[in-house]
Amino acid sequence: MKRILIAPVRFYQRFISPVFPPSCRFELTCSNYMIQAIEKHGFKGVLMGLSRILRCHPWSKTGKDPVPDRFSLKRNQEGE
């Protein structure tokens, strides 16, 4: 199941992301965050990854935002 959820992210990393300049505002890119979240939390990791993508915009804080040990849709406070 996790492989199926991760496959579209790997496709994005391999074929779509290289076409555009780097733009992620966080350390641990959004696509890598989603992969780690899926590996750690299963389907809930997809929700965490989508939440992270929505937080990745020019007006957000930058910096470290590691995948939390517990499911959460908020930014990991340990990363600040």
From Swiss-Prot:
Record membrane topology: Peripheral membrane protein
Record flagged with keyword Cell membrane: yes
Sequence segments annotated as region (Disordered): 61-80
Keyword Cell membrane: yes
Superkingdom, natural source: Bacteria
GO CC list: plasma membrane
Protein family according to the UniProt entry: Belongs to the UPF0161 family.
Function statement: Could be involved in insertion of integral membrane proteins into the membrane.
UniProt protein name: Putative membrane protein insertion efficiency factor
Species, as recorded: Streptococcus pneumoniae (strain P1031)
